[in-house]
Amino acid sequence: MLVLTLATISTLAVSPQNAQAQKEAFEVVSVKLIVPGSGPGRPGMFMNAGPGCSLTGVQVDPRRVAVAAPLFTLIATAHGGNCRVPDMIIGGTDWMKTDRWDIEAVMPEGSPTYTPAQFVGGNAPKINAMLQTLLADRFKVAVHRETREVTVNVLTVGKGSPKLAAANDADQPARRINARKDQEGKPFLEFIAGKATMATLAEMLQLATSRPVVDRTGISGNFNIRFEYDNDGIARPTVFTALQEELGLRLESAKEKMEVLVIDRAEKPSDN
């Protein structure tokens, strides 16, 4: 089962970066509104992190790109945002999270080859640039970035010494949060960060807490991290308790000024 994985935006009309991104475009594009209850849809890789934040039927093979998603998720994917951290994307209307769109597109000859996992994880820059162009053309999407004060979680060392297992050179990086069930069928989540820095841990904790996380541990090095948690604290401790008990780290709420993505405009396209 695919679970949560990791994923520069300025005003589209003026930014040099976005001007460059506008030059990147798919050769062929099909955009269709998905009718609710119309069936299971296209098979493929998926990511589901709650209402308005999902990608399904993801295929990249090798020039053809296909995905089904709400516009909110498509904007976040195209512009390097994170739909799993709501405070970091401002604006938009309800239909952008509820209506789902099926998109099929063909990249130009000579485009880089990506895997579905790279696209879902935000590591397919050429596809993202072409998706920016598609969204601007078909959905009339315009966005910009600005600095706002938002609620964050600050990662610090708890009471006593941190309990972290240092990674070896031979260890492999790993970044995943797996959905599991215990012997009684109660669901919980398995957090795995292999050969990870504290900055990487902070990035992954954004997915677990749906808030920006700022690393203030002062700890350097790579570590193998694994713990189990439950958002409701029933089958397992909450992520906050698990961090303290298993790793000797704390998450504390605070206000910080951070750069956020602001959605200025979007329209529903016509089917083609």
Regions picked out by a protein language model, each given a short descriptive name:
Residues 1-272:
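Beta-strand-rich assembly/attachment modules of structural machines
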